[in-house]
């Protein structure tokens, strides 16, 4: 699987598979409690149309690869391996 194909994995579905659901949602995006740190007010935004995320409290964002790197404190290559693992929600 190429890096571009991996980046197409749906962030919303990935978060849902991890049990992380939006606090507020519109057709184009959702606000979540950050999966990267403790917080009481949702400041983690996922743009569903661009398949990108941004944590306003931490000042970081990016693709699903960046999200996995931050969530699991792993490097780029380990994140690619993680996202290629069987059982992960995929985009066809």
Q: Which ranges hold each PLM region?
A:
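N-terminal structured subdomain of primase-like DNA metabolism proteins
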Residues: 1-92
